[in-house]
Amino acid sequence: MSEESQVPSDPLGRYEGLLREWLIESGGRRVDVYYNAIHLTGEIEYWLIDRQGREQPVRPSREVRFALHDVRPAQTDPHRGAWLWSHLWMEASDGVLHQECDWMREPVIGSDPVGDGDAAFELDQFPRDPQWVPEWMAVKAAAYHKEAERRERRRQRDRERRARKKAEAAGAAEATGEQSGSDASGQVDE
């Protein structure tokens, strides 16, 4: 690893240095990175444009890929939360990382839709001002919380039912002991 990639202490600067180093080593002209994320789930695609202008999917070094995971939390905005989609790119000619982000777009991760829990956990992990909560996220988070409340009510009913059964069983055992005819002296009535 070069000294240049170790110097930046901020995640974006570190990622920029690692990506620049990898791009130069790969001999590419440009790299584009597409990052969809919500909560702890994400999908990242890297596309390299080689010197002949051909675009191809690539998989950079592990160090480059892992460094990107620190960028999103570091860029959290106190009002908008964390972005959900980002396009990062770098031209080998200038070695500067560029970025555009979207805080409102519903991420597309694989073929699975974003789950209700993902939306709720995203809001817990990266809170947002109400005007920065997209409708799709609000609907999914509300559905998750409604289901969680329903499950908690069911668990409470189950706890109460078990407690009643336990009390009934204890009462029945006590009643059975009384019905056997024993008194406090241990003598049996005849």
Task: Locate the predicted segments by residue.
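Short beta-strand micro-motifs enriched in acidic
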Residues: 89-93
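Extended intrinsically disordered, low-complexity coil regions enriched in Ser, Thr, Gly, Ala
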Residues: 35-63, 81, 98-112
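Surface-exposed polar/charged interaction patches
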Residues: 21-25, 74, 139, 168
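Short, solvent-exposed interaction modules
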Residues: 59-80, 86
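N-terminal "first-domain core" detector
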Residues: 1-54
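Alpha-helix boundary/N-cap detector
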Residues: 3-10, 14, 59-66, 124-131
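Acidic, proline/glycine-rich low-complexity IDRs
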Residues: 98-190
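Short, structured motif recognition centered on aromatic/hydrophobic residues
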Residues: 31, 86-88
